[in-house]
């Protein structure tokens, strides 16, 4: 039996992922490392985004364009849900986009992930922490909501964190090139230490302060890739059964 070139090409096609609210690409690069073909979308210019990029409003994208992808990741603005907004009581100054983003993603029918900070109104989220990844030296809790199963790794104890921020109870200088560091505007670790701690080598300090480590989405991306592969296998089995039924 000769297998058609078209069939082989379809079977070997790389899965495409749409990275919404992509900023400088912490999430997108993690998916890329798994093997996804990633396209980023952000309403603001992102000159340091290291993958194909489209400047556009994620809330008004053409549904047909979104449907051309296999999965979608979204990191809507987190400021309204942040600890800082709660302390300053100014959360209403920022847009709350999780609900409208969820509605848009659900309508696509595609597997999706929504990422945000602790306290964000995500549904049954998985929590990822830097302590779960040996290559990282940040705490960096982030929530991930998905419409496919994600297994969370064990969550270990938090080590002491290097920071210059006097508001933190772990204030004090140690060795920022070896210890855990606070990668935020108030943490004030150097850009070199921040890049090493986060596994990111292409962002500015301001960009990295708002980023998630690629290790997080690399971890989720592996499970997403397995989910997509299982879906394709089921679709193939269904097609084979239907073919046999029609041919009988």
Question: Where are the regions that the model predicts?
Answer:
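SAM cofactor-binding core of SAM-dependent methyltransferases
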Residues: 16-62, 73-74, 81
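Exposed boundary/loop context
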Residues: 1, 16-19, 192
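Class I S-adenosyl-L-methionine
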Residues: 42, 55-71, 78-242
